Amino acid sequence: MANSSPVYDWFNERLEIQDIVDDISSKYVPPHVNIFYCLGGITLVCFLIQFATGFAMTFYYKPTVVEAYSSVQYLMTDVSFGWLIRSVHRWSASMMVLMLILHVFRVYLTGGFKRPRELTWVTGVTMAVITVSFGVTGYSLPWDQVGYWAVKIVSGVPAAVPVVGDFMVELLRGGESVGQSTLTRFYSLHTFVLPWLLAVFMLAHFLMIRKQGISGPL
């Protein structure tokens, strides 16, 4: 690399950074690719915004049935730019779902799910389910009237499943009724379990795209 700095040369000698950069920058991009092929990348950007703003809110949010609502109000009214952080979190959540839907439609309409990219499609659909789960679990965290009744209805849906329905309901709620255990479980899912799951499937998704390349035109 021409005119590289001594620091860059030191790292490049040990990590072969330039080889990685050359491999990424020389990847072939088919001529039929247009702006609609950026929808997946926009979805990723929305997720990163979600991660950053969500992490910021964990400094103030208190996952208890007594303090959850008041902690959200404190974030919105007393914390500097707290209202902006939460608003960006909500807006980017809606944008992420919208971009995800459009991305799925684009892949389906252009045949990007066909052989040999079936597993890429499967990981994408799995991430779509995880994204919806983010919405369900996050909706309940303010623990206001809307959040409480939403989690009560959602957690009661598995009761219709034969044999294991009641067990699934109790597993989600942490007991027979909606309460502190329910909020704790939804908070854990929203801030720990689902982000890690999404990160794992996202990594697999990108590695397969990297390996197989962008699908050709129909």
Swiss-Prot record:
Compartmental location: Cellular thylakoid membrane
Q: Which NCBIfam families does the entry mention? A: PRK03735.1
Q: How does it assemble?
A: The 4 large subunits of the cytochrome b6-f complex are cytochrome b6, subunit IV (17 kDa polypeptide, PetD), cytochrome f and the Rieske protein, while the 4 small subunits are PetG, PetL, PetM and PetN. The complex functions as a dimer.
A Gene Ontology molecular function term for this protein is: metal ion binding
Share any extra remarks. Heme 1 (or BH or b566) is high-potential and absorbs at about 566 nm, and heme 2 (or BL or b562) is low-potential and absorbs at about 562 nm.
**Which PROSITE patterns does the entry link to?**
CYTB_NTER
Q: What is this protein called?
A: Cytochrome b6
SUPFAM superfamilies, per database record: Transmembrane di-heme cytochromes
